[in-house]
Swiss-Prot record:
The name this protein goes by in its record: Large ribosomal subunit protein eL38
Family affiliation: Belongs to the eukaryotic ribosomal protein eL38 family.
UniProt keyword annotations, A-Z: Acetylation, Cytoplasm, Isopeptide bond, Ribonucleoprotein, Ribosomal protein, Ubl conjugation
Subcellular location(s) of the protein: Cytoplasm
Native species: Homo sapiens
Gene of this entry: RPL38
């Protein structure tokens, strides 16, 4: 079941949760989507700024499996 997250801080808190399994990063020409899989929901954050997306990618938790998609 999908859920949308609007704020970067909320996304980082969700990514640090114990039930967060993996993060998928989808890059389009317009935006970058970060999708974190938790036990119940798939949380999605959409970022239109490429520099913010790179910063967020660097600040993801180290134990989380990160997969980049086109």
């Amino acid at each position: 079941m999908p859920r949308k997250i609007e704020e970067i801080k909320d996304f980082l808190l969700t990514a640090r949760r114990k039930d967060a399994k993996s993060v998928k990063i989808k890059k389009n020409k317009d935006n970058v989507k970060f999708k974190v899989r938790c036990s119940r929901y798939l949380y999605t954050l959409v970022i239109t700024d490429k520099e913010k997306a790179e910063k967020l990618k660097q600040s993801l938790p180290p134990g989380l499996a990160v997969k980049e998609l086109k």
